[in-house]
Amino acid sequence: MGGCVGSHHDSSGSLNENSDGTGVALGRNQPLKREKPKWKSDYPMTDGQLRSKRDEFWDTAPAFEGRKEIWDALKAAAQAFESNDHELAQAIIDGASITLPHGALTECYDELGNRYQLPVYCLSPPVNMIEEKSESETIEVPEAPASEGQECQLRLRLSTGRDLRLAVRTSDSVQQMKRRLQTQEGVAATSQRWFFSGRPLTDKMKLEELKISRDYVVQVIVSQPPTTPPLPQNPTPVEN
């Protein structure tokens, strides 16, 4: 998934040199290259699944090593880079004093020598992306009869920071459980993205197929419409 580890320094205090004998130190800063990484996912991925994977990384990466303000800067730089705003991405990197030994966001260092690694899926979509069906094209999943499956409590952790238990049946599909959460908490089913152990859960998956133990937590990413930041106001001059 990528992450942050301590950088490796030699006895002179500089980063180790390349093994090709060029003598170019890995710690020497290089400008951000414009080329985006090309990669293929292990399975065809929709835009929603890619967003879930990215959200999971950015939600958990700062919890390991490194400084949160650097992770925030790297996230902003990655978003600008993917949007082809190369100048903004470079400005963010320079402003946070981030070093790129290879000119790529896949390996970065802060001023303290901490190493940060961004996975390629945070920088560009895979070559095997597939279109996500619109709501009108989505096949309705029939509700399971109330007599089918066993009743149980499913532990959920919402991206809003709330933990809760949801009354479900083992025969429920993910789509049906989304509707139950919508009824209980008022969270629109279409704005929910569920994943368990880093795996996106599709609407047709059945709870009994997922083999989720009682003590495990299913994470729910709730998509929220972007808010427009308020325009800065001119400060009122202070009279002497």
UniProtKB/Swiss-Prot annotation:
One GO term describing the cellular component: cytoplasm
Residue ranges of the region described as Disordered: 1-48
Biased composition (Polar residues): 12-21
Disulfide links within the chain: none
Keyword Oxidoreductase on entry: no
Basic and acidic residues composition-biased segments: 32-41
Key words, A-Z: Cytoplasm
Domain Ubiquitin-like as annotated: residue spans: 152-227
Xref: Gene3D superfamilies: Phosphatidylinositol 3-kinase Catalytic Subunit, Chain A, domain 1 (3.10.20.90), Ub domain-containing protein, DC-UbP/UBTD2, N-terminal domain (1.20.225.20)
Subcellular location: Cytoplasm
Keyword Cytoplasm on entry: yes
Database matches in PANTHER family: UBIQUITIN DOMAIN CONTAINING 1 PROTEIN-RELATED
Protein name: Ubiquitin domain-containing protein 2
Gene: ubtd2
